[in-house]
Amino acid sequence: MTGRLIYLMGPSGSGKDSLLQAAREPLALRGCRIVRRVITRSAEAVGEDAQAVTPAQFDTLERASAFAMSWRANGLCYGIPVQIDEWLAQGYDVLVNGSRGYLAQARRRYPDLLAVLLGVQPEVLRQRLLARGRESPEEIEARLARNAEFAAGLEGPLFQLDNSGELDDTVRALLAWLGGDRACA
């Protein structure tokens, strides 16, 4: 049996890291693997469970075919370890923290991937980004405009998951959507 690749994506501030953290235990109990991605920024700086590497280390890993998927966005490099192919072949469902901008390429490599778009209402997203304090109000407005463009441009089937409310509700909705008799159900 082949596992399912669950490709989570959403704008900065949508709560992807919070969702992954909150869903980690219930998904693990169901046999789902949550991938630790490789990123060229300190994991502490992003608040996610990521392996931080330098740009030179990332390039070395990429040349060595250590990634099943890799992309560049916002001045950073992101990689999904090639180990996911082994897990999928063993029948495990695998959840990755992906990129909206890389979805088309991911679908070419994994045509049956399950795309999950985590979103929030624009005003909620604005408030979350302001609370983080990393960007100016003008940069936040530009980010919100890009978010609307990205959402309109995504093609193919995808599950839209609203994280504007309580995180527990979002976790329950994700688990219900992944229902069935698979490893992640």
Curated annotation (Swiss-Prot):
- Which EC number(s) are documented for this chain? 2.7.4.23
| Cysteine disulfide links | none
Q: Which SMART domains match?
A: GuKc
Question: Example GO biological process term?
Answer: 5-phosphoribose 1-diphosphate biosynthetic process
Q: Which SUPFAM superfamilies match?
A: P-loop containing nucleoside triphosphate hydrolases (SSF52540)
- Alphabetical keyword list: ATP-binding, Nucleotide-binding, Transferase
Q: Which residues bind ATP?
A: 10-17
| Chemical reaction(s) catalysed | alpha-D-ribose 1,5-bisphosphate + ATP = 5-phospho-alpha-D-ribose 1-diphosphate + ADP
Q: What's the top EC group for this one?
A: transferase
As one GO molecular function, the record gives:
ribose 1,5-bisphosphate phosphokinase activity
Q: In which pathway does it act?
A: Metabolic intermediate biosynthesis; 5-phospho-alpha-D-ribose 1-diphosphate biosynthesis; 5-phospho-alpha-D-ribose 1-diphosphate from D-ribose 5-phosphate (route II): step 3/3
Q: Which NCBIfam families match?
A: phosphon_PhnN, PRK10078.1
The family this protein is said to belong to = Belongs to the ribose 1,5-bisphosphokinase family.
Q: What's this chain's function? A: Catalyzes the phosphorylation of ribose 1,5-bisphosphate to 5-phospho-D-ribosyl alpha-1-diphosphate (PRPP).
Q: What is this protein called?
A: Ribose 1,5-bisphosphate phosphokinase PhnN
Q: Which organism is it from?
A: Pseudomonas paraeruginosa (strain DSM 24068 / PA7)
Q: Please spell out the taxonomic lineage of the organism that makes this protein.
A: Bacteria, Pseudomonadati, Pseudomonadota, Gammaproteobacteria, Pseudomonadales
